[in-house]
Amino acid sequence: APSDTTIAETLTITEEFFPD
């Protein structure tokens, strides 16, 4: 399973591509 750091990085990158 991915580490919490990897999950956090993914969420940050997702925010860049799909900003609220």
UniProtKB/Swiss-Prot annotation:
Region annotated Disordered, chain positions: 1-20
GO MF terms, alphabetically ordered: serine-type endopeptidase inhibitor activity
UniProt KW keywords: Protease inhibitor, Secreted, Serine protease inhibitor
Keyword Nucleotide-binding: no
Compartment annotation: Secreted, Extracellular space
Annotated Gene Ontology cellular component terms: extracellular region
Cystine crosslinks: none
Tissue: Hemolymph.
Function of the molecule: Inhibits trypsin stoichiometrically. Also inhibits chymotrypsin very weakly.
The protein, known as: Trypsin inhibitor
Organism: Mythimna unipuncta
